[in-house]
Amino acid sequence: MRCKLLLFDLDGTLLRTDKTISKVTMQELEKCRERGIMIGVSTSRSEKNSMEFISELNPDVVISSAGALVKYRGTYIYKAEFTKAETKDLIQKAWEICGEDCEITIDTVDEHYWNYKIDPKQQDRSWGDSVYTDFYDFDHESLKMCVEIFDEKAAEKLQQNLSGCDCVRFSDGYWYKFTKKTATKENAILHMCKECGITTDEIAAFGDDYADIGMLKLCGIGVAMGNAIDEVKAVADYVIGNNDNDGIGKYLQNAMMERFQL
């Protein structure tokens, strides 16, 4: 297989814990680009909250909001949006089941909205500018809703009430993401392949969390980080070093010629 695209999750994968990309990794990515390999990002973050890294990487492909939005070389090629009415229903059900004080974030194509008690940028400086709202008069189409739910029974009930959505819990906390059923990273990859004229066998995908399992299984090479959850490691073709110790950079250094057939 000749690899034509390297596709990276951000948090826990391409990004170190301090939310930076190592110099070693950036150097190896540039070498790959010089050999004609495209670089892509596939993240659960909104595009808005990924801009710091998008600007640094200048990727050919950006899959954001957990697969609900796909951009190829600057042009949107796929959107899986909830209507305004559907978005209001999502918010209402979250309030009914989890309480009106539950923390919610919503991605739209242009913005990231939140009702946190604390500005998220105070906790993570890499987080892009967000728009604060109490969501009572929210009137936008949306790509993704995330809800922080500490009670497992409430989480299960909300998932049951939103059975028409794709729901994934993030492993590092109590946040659950809800998107359209069609909005997954793997489905986004299929749309991207049609536009790019490549096959999934020509993609190497890197990830660490539940939302990455499907894309690692789909792509020709699935690579799990050393810090990945066990479920991701179980489906990967390779398990490499962790995100804080140049896992990706070292993998590209040592395996590129052999596995990518360059």
Describe the function of each predicted region.
Residues 59-66, 80, 124-125, 167-170, ...:
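Short hydrophobic/aromatic-enriched beta-strand-loop microsegments
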Residues 97-206, 210-218, 227:
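Conserved acidic, metal-coordinating active-site core of Asp-based
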Residues 18-120:
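Active-site phosphate-binding/coordination module
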Residues 1-4, 16, 22, 177-262:
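Mg2+-dependent phosphoryl-transfer enzymes with acidic/Ser/Thr/Gly-rich catalytic loops
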Residues 57-58, 66, 161-164, 218-219, ...:
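Short, structured coil segments at secondary-structure junctions
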Residues 7-8:
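Walker B beta-strand of ABC/ABC-like P-loop ATPase nucleotide-binding domains
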Residues 32, 43, 66, 145, ...:
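Residue-level signal for inorganic ion chemistry
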Residues 12, 67, 207-209:
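Active-site metal-binding loops of divalent metal-dependent hydrolases
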